[in-house]
A protein has these predicted regions:
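STAS-like cytosolic regulatory interaction modules
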Residues: 1-52, 66-121
Length: 121
């Protein structure tokens, strides 16, 4: 919807983190989907940090669901970070929060992943 989408991937505490900023819509969702699918195929937990996303439409939600399915098919998982009330509300309204419960901070997700594998934080 006009605002550019930026997608940056890095590793934090040994986990791939994809930070997304801007608007995810029909025009930009394919880029996000491709990047998430690439990292989801590795078969490890993957974090999508959507905290800087101001808008997401059904194409963006579909990209997240597809990435979660791909990660699960390869033995991994997708975790979402989102503190913004608009995006969190959309997750609630669509029921996506039951499939991909959004964490409020990146540290919250990483702490949980580290605890699950028994590693010190």
């Amino acid at each position: 919807m006009g605002e550019a989408l930026t997608i940056e991937a890095r590793h934090e505490r040994g986990y791939p983190v994809v930070t997304v900023a801007g608007e995810i819509d029909i025009a930009t969702a394919t880029r996000l989907r491709e990047r998430l699918f690439e990292l989801a195929a590795v078969g490890r937990p993957l974090v999508a940090d959507l905290d800087q996303v101001r808008f997401i439409d059904s194409a963006g939600l579909a990209a997240l669901v597809g990435a979660a399915k791909r990660a699960a098919a390869h033995g991994g998982s997708l975790h979402v970070v989102c503190a913004g009330p608009r995006v969190r509300q959309l997750f609630r309204l669509t029921g996506l929060d039951r499939r991909l419960p959004p964490a409020r901070t990146l540290d919250e997700v990483l702490d949980a992943l580290m605890a699950a594998r028994g590693a010190p934080r």
